[in-house]
Amino acid sequence: MAKAEQDKSSKTLDIKLNRILAGNYQSTDFIIADAKDADMAFGVRAAGPRAGRNFEDNGPEIFKTRSEYLQDMREVIAQGVLDIILTSASNGEKLFKDKALGKKITLAVRGNDASDIWNPRGGNYPASPSRPFATANLKIISKFCDLVLYSMTFNNDLDHDIRTLQAYKEFRMQAAEHGVRHFLEVFNPNTPQNLQPKQTGSFVNDHIVRALAGVTSEERPKFLKIAYNGSESLRELSEHDPSLIVGILGGSAGTTRDTFELLYRAERSGGRVALFGRKIQRAESPLDLV
């Protein structure tokens, strides 16, 4: 078992997951996560620009600092509404050591950072097929966290997709060795090959089910994180296997109405988790939105 594992009976995430899997879902069991792992993608820009500044600007005093980012996390944790806070390994460790997490919220750490999330200013990595990569060390992470996010991207590109699946297999073996649970993020293709846009939802659904068909219960993800590809696509996946709890990612920033409309449509179509990052961070009042 992970060294960081605590009594899960008080964690709202595990309480809700158990109710959902038992077929006793109610709207109050919808799981809310704040994805504050943007430092793994955007570097200095992770916490966002200061008022009046632009996300593409450069220079000192333009972006919020790491300390401010951590303070944002402490404030949203203290609010007591979230079930999960997702961070980078370094920030998760800091929150744990500072005893900022409390008893009810679950800390999750990004377990890999494939190339399609690399977004430095001036960079162009997402224009190339996703390549698997992981900075984080699960052995070290297990000392303070027992839940990690693992992400995959399929592009209908045989060589790259095989590497993606092989890396996921290796990750699962390491996670089992160190007693770490995971949830699985499957992005839409970032450089799709011979794939029509209207096929994206079914392509992703089939890849998820196919990839997990050979994974036994001990290694299966606790839930999924995918893009919302329409109600029919989400309903197809959520109805296919009740043991797969499906969650949606928030994507880019939007209006408050956009956020609640997405939540409504997702839940109606079988979604049971929302993992929002920029939609919370760039809201006019992040705490009120949560």
Regions found by a protein language model. Name each.
Residues M1-N156:
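Alpha/beta catalytic barrel-like cores
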Residues K11, N156-Q166, A253-T255:
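Active-site glycine- and acidic-residue-rich loops that bind
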Residues V81, G102-T106, S217-R220, E239-G247, ...:
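Glycine-enriched alpha-helix->loop->beta-strand junction motifs that scaffold or abut catalytic
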Residues I84-S90, A108-R110, S151-T164, R181-F183, ...:
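Catalytic beta/alpha-barrel core
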Residues A89, G250-G251, R278:
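Short secondary-structure boundary segments
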Residues K97-W118, T164-H178, S202-V209, L234-A253, ...:
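Alpha-helix-loop-beta-strand connector modules within alpha/beta enzyme cores
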Residues E185, G277:
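Conserved, mostly hydrophobic/aromatic
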Residues E267, Q281-V290:
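C-terminal helical cap(s) of enzyme catalytic domains, especially alpha/beta-barrels
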